[in-house]
Design a protein with these regions (language model features):
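Domain-scale detector for complete catalytic domains at protein termini or as standalone homologs
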Residues: 1-16, 20-24, 37-41, 58, ...
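Gly/Ser/Thr-rich phosphate-binding loops and adjoining beta-strand/alpha-helix segments
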Residues: 5-8, 20-52, 68-84, 136-138, ...
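Acyl-group handling in specialized metabolite and lipid biosynthesis
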Residues: 27-30, 38-44, 93-107, 187
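Acyl activation and transfer enzymes in specialized metabolism, enriched
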Residues: 38-63, 176-195
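Active-site loop/lid in soluble adenylation, ligation, and acyl-transfer enzymes
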Residues: 52-54, 58-70, 76, 93, ...
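Helical lid/core segments from catalytic subdomains that handle acyl or acyl-like groups
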Residues: 90-146
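Histidine-centered acyl-transfer/condensation active-site motif
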Residues: 130-143, 160-197
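Core mixed alpha/beta domains of very large multi-subunit molecular machines
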Residues: 149-151
Length: 209
């Protein structure tokens, strides 16, 4: 459930006052991930690579307190649940957004991912969870190799945002550059680095039981 909190009563109070009126309050960090393990799990399990990456993102974000607060509209909001948003390309061309509620149970998350992305494709309508969840936004540009995306900001969309392109196969490992953009009133570089390191650890330890 979403509720407004007083920034002064939050650990983010100073950062909120410092960054709430900044012209560009978002920071982008680029990191190259070793996703060799994730690709192997996808092949063995038959699960989609993008679904596995989205689950790993939710898993890495879930223990970090800052992911449950979000600055928007000059206010600071607190949530108690997370979702991962993915972009769905529909049959007639336009893309739509799809929020998938994060679950520690990867099988439940996979079921929701398949059901909801199929719903978006069939209806040509966004599926957004609204005020119930803080969504971590993602975008995948598999048509080309990119290092990431920067300078994506709107006062209407202050959510953390990860973007990546086609993964890169090497002789011994497969890598994927990812950009992570976050609102500086939501978190600092320390929390962002903790999340990115946690994402690599989650990918490394990925198993399907």
């Amino acid at each position: 459930m979403k509720q407004e909190i007083n920034p002064k009563d939050s650990p983010r109070g100073f950062a909120f006052e410092l960054w709430k009126t900044a012209g560009m309050p978002k920071v982008t960090i680029f990191k190259t991930f070793d996703i060799t393990r994730l690709i192997k799990v996808a092949k063995r399990s038959g699960m989609k690579t993008n679904m596995l990456m989205c689950w790993c993102i939710g898993k890495a974000a879930s223990p970090i307190e800052e992911f449950y607060t979000l600055p928007a509209g000059g206010h600071l909001w607190q949530y108690d649940r997370l979702a991962v948003n993915t972009v769905v390309k529909t049959a007639n061309g336009p893309v739509h957004l799809c929020d998938i509620p994060f679950s520690e149970d990867i099988h439940q998350f996979n079921e929701d991912y398949l059901r909801l992305t199929r719903q978006v494709r069939d209806t040509n309508e966004d599926h957004l969870l609204g005020d119930e969840y803080m969504a971590v936004d993602t975008s995948t540009l598999v048509e080309c190799e990119i290092d990431g995306v920067a300078s994506v900001y709107s006062e209407l969309f202050t959510n953390p945002f990860l973007a990546w392109g086609r993964y890169r196969r090497g002789l011994f490992k497969t890598t994927l550059p990812i950009s992570f953009q976050f609102h500086h009133a939501q978190m600092d570089g320390f929390e962002a680095a903790r999340f990115l390191n946690g994402l690599q650890e989650t990918v490394n330890g990925l198993t399907i039981r």
